[in-house]
Design a protein with these regions (language model features):
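Transmembrane-helix boundary/entry motifs in multi-pass membrane transporters
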Residues: 2-4, 36-42, 65-94, 112-118, ...
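Hydrophobic alpha-helical segments and their helix-loop junctions in multi-pass secondary transporters
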Residues: 22, 92, 96, 129, ...
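Selective recognition of specific alpha-helical transmembrane segments in multi-pass small-molecule
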Residues: 45-56, 99, 150-162, 224-249, ...
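Extracellular loop-to-transmembrane helix junctions
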Residues: 5-9, 33-60, 224-238, 333-344
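Helix-loop-helix connectors at the membrane interface of multi-pass transporters/channels
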Residues: 72-78, 102-122, 213-234, 287-310
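Membrane-interface interhelical connector segments
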Residues: 177-183, 244-267
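Membrane-interface loop-to-helix entry segments
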Residues: 106-108, 117-125, 132-165, 328-346
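Hydrophobic, membrane-embedded alpha-helices of multi-pass small-molecule transporters
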Residues: 6-25, 44, 91-95, 99, ...
Length: 358
């Protein structure tokens, strides 16, 4: 029993760790996809939860049942060879696109936290990531990546503390946000927003979750761990969203809303939180950039380092031009709609298996 509980908690932690990175910690995506709708955002969270729990549990259990060994196997299982290759390619392109978003997020975080130009932050993050990927400093990424737990704890602690300061302001904030036009939204409809929030994450989850499920000891662990991870993740979204609503007039003007909350609690806390966010961005960014570059050009090729440098410079340029909120709004919407197409395949496969009794 204890072994099953530990394994389930490990699965739940992996789910949250995958989804809660530097981008989530900034709060910008949660502002757009949930808080911008006021208390209707709770409905958006519910929509996200339903899609998430269905897909995550399905991915985990299929991974074990079908002995999925890699992302190619997963996409082929759900979509067939041709469509599977297409979605695998889309998931692959998401790596480099997300790197650009991370560069933009680093620029916004440093600009808001230390009052410098966003280009400085994007450039510093870009150079660090390029050097890391060129030199193969995988161990450094693993060490910094262990701070992911601290990032999650700080987000929960900061937003929870801020929420407790004035919980009665939630209703007022919900009414106020309806009159604000400066906050970008993925859709005018809260339900569509909740739907897109999970579908833009879907291709990445489909590439990762089946492999996680394949390594578990039992399907019970997969189901319990999957549901627990979804509850924890969506519960964190609710906490952050409600905290935003208590001061939406100011939060809605910030590119890094969670950092603003930390600044209101204590300047030292805000400075430390800025660094933790940047380390979270660095970890996710370096891993994604490494995976992308090494799949395009082999690491032992003489073209590998020039490719890493040139592509990284382009990433820095795009990352410093695009405002963080605009980057999230446009890019995540595009991948949300692509993820919606993939969701149809997942649902169709589920019912086909049910019908055949397999």
């Amino acid at each position: 029993m204890n072994s099953m509980l530990f394994s389930s908690l490990t699965i739940a932690g992996a789910i949250c760790g995958y989804l809660i990175g530097g981008g989530f910690a900034s709060g910008q995506e949660l502002l757009q996809y949930f808080a911008s709708y006021g208390l209707k955002g709770l409905g958006a969270v519910a929509v996200s939860f339903l899609i998430m729990v269905f897909c995550v549990v399905n991915f985990l259990t299929v991974g074990k049942k079908e002995n999925i060994q890699n992302a190619h196997d997963a996409f082929t299982y759900y979509c067939g060879k041709k469509a599977g290759s297409f979605f695998e390619f889309i998931a692959f392109t998401y790596l480099i696109v997300q790197v650009i978003v991370f560069f933009t997020g680093a620029g916004a975080t440093i600009a808001q936290g230390f009052d410098v130009s966003p280009f400085v932050g994007s450039a510093i993050m870009g150079v660090l990531v390029i050097i890391t990927v060129m030199l193969g400093l995988r161990k450094l990424i693993d060490i910094v990546g262990s701070l992911g737990v601290l990032l999650v704890v700080m987000v929960i602690g900061i937003t929870g503390t801020f929420l407790l300061k004035n919980p009665s302001a939630i209703i007022e904030g919900s009414e106020q946000v309806a009159t604000m036009s400066n906050i970008l939204q993925p859709s005018k409809n809260w339900a569509v927003s909740g739907f897109l929030y999970m579908t833009f994450n879907l291709l990445g989850l489909a590439a990762f979750m089946p492999l996680l499920g394949q390594k578990s000891e039992s399907q019970s662990e997969n189901v319990f761990g999957g549901v627990l991870g979804c509850v924890a993740f969506c519960g964190t979204i609710v906490l952050v969203m409600l905290a935003f609503l208590t001061d939406i007039g100011n939060v809605g003007t910030k590119l890094v809303p969670n950092l603003y909350l930390a600044q209101q609690l204590h300047p030292t806390l805000a400075s430390f939180f800025s660094i933790v966010i940047l380390l979270g961005i660095y970890t996710g960014c370096a891993l994604m950039y490494w995976n992308f570059c090494s799949r395009v050009v082999p690491e032992n090729s003489k073209y590998y380092k020039p490719f890493v440098i040139i592509l990284g410079v382009f990433g820095i340029i795009f990352g410093s031009i695009l405002p963080f909120d605009v980057a999230i709004n446009i890019i995540y919407q595009i991948y949300g709609y692509l993820g919606t197409l993939f969701l149809f395949f997942v649902i169709a496969k589920f019912f086909m298996k049910k019908k055949s009794g397999k």
